[in-house]
Amino acid sequence: MTHRSNLLPAFFALAMAGMPLVFAQHENGKKENVLYVWASDQAHKAPDFLAVVEFNEDSAHYGRVISTVPLPPPGNTGNEPHHCHLSTDKKVLACGGLLSLLKGQNGIFFFDVSDARHPRFLLSTKAVESSITDDFLPLPEGGFLITQMGSASGEAPGRIAEFDGQLHFVANHFGLMSLVQEWPSTPPLDGFNPHGISARPDLNLMMTADFILPTSTLNGTTGVALRNTVRIWDYRARKITKTVKLMSPDGGPALGIMDVKMLPGDPNGIGYVAGMFDGHIYMIDPRTGTGTAAFDCEDVQPHVDTPVVGGMGQILATPKSGDRLIFALFQAGQVGMLDTTNRSNLKQVPGAIVSFGANSGPHNLVLTEDDSRLVVSDYFLNEDDQGVIHFEGDHKVRVIKVTHDSLTEDTRFQLDFNTAFPTGPARPHGLAMK
């Protein structure tokens, strides 16, 4: 029997009441000086861990690992660390374990980062009707919406798990946040496997992107089932109002909609998604519930030939100017910028592209609050002997300097997770800055 104690209700208090999330300012007007990287030991022997990295550009140790915070046992290996996100008040870091289910472990982890350079592990937990934890959307009032790509058994339908800001400690290191709900109350049965999530609370709109049926990627299954749907939500009611089924220009379905990003400030709530295996970026119009191809990644210059058409577009990032979209191509090894002035016909910003080399694997993209730096992690997912997904990347974490019309690699920042730790090569995935 577990025993709850030490209620900590304050971690997710709103930092600036009434301020829209996408326009939050730096705490005390300061730039981020600490980078968190949520990672795993490639050999699955050392614990999964949070790396704390010097992110102060004025420091002589810029780009060096300050410390690591390993997960405590039990359940501290084999979680496949995936995405992470800071709470609105930047005091708690929430992290996900994509494959925790395969070992019967909790898959949602929380760290106290109120002392930015000395984070400490708080607790782990899991949802009830869902698993395969993916992305986190911090809520202005505290807590998170979390995409759970699979059901409790890793199949369909998945859910959006909502946790409020009440933290409860229980016996051992396991715990429960106050789980408000898993949404929607009656989930659709047409391939609801949400991966990406984006919201415009000011418009009462939210979007989620269905990517893949998780269990279909495991050994012994009949084949990978990719999804091509985007869900439009009533943000406040937590209710799906429209389902957008995307078709590629060749007439077939879009293949694997991993991420979704809504443009800041767009009056209609326009968003964008990338078809990972069909090579297109699609515009989503929530008013009409439609999606159309807006850019062909085969047209990216310089062009890199890759096994997957379009170089394998995955994660997107949206500067607050509202007229730019940043994308990463995993197999092409490129990070580029698109002009979104014409919402349905995106154009590559001339010269705004950084090439790291074919198969370097840029995947996760996170902008600083002032949009001046973009952090990139070069690792997606390797299921090793458990499944058919083997997208390793080169395990580097990089920084790109960003202006309205340019992307330039910050060569002062050098961080290679193959050599940074005495335990051996590690796989960097989740990113957050404070």
Locations of the language-model features?
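Surface-exposed loop and turn segments in beta-propeller and other repeat-based domains
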Residues: 64-79, 123-129, 172-192, 240-256, ...
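Loop/turn-rich, solvent-exposed surfaces of beta-rich toroidal or solenoidal domains
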Residues: 306-390, 395-397
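Beta-propeller domains
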Residues: 87, 189-342
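Beta-propeller blade signature
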Residues: 51-55, 106-114, 157-167, 223-237, ...
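Structural signature of eukaryotic scaffold interfaces centered on beta-propeller domains
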Residues: 25-31, 80-89, 136-140, 193-204, ...
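Asp-box/WD-like beta-propeller blade repeats and closely related beta-sheet repeat scaffolds
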Residues: 107, 113-201, 210, 216
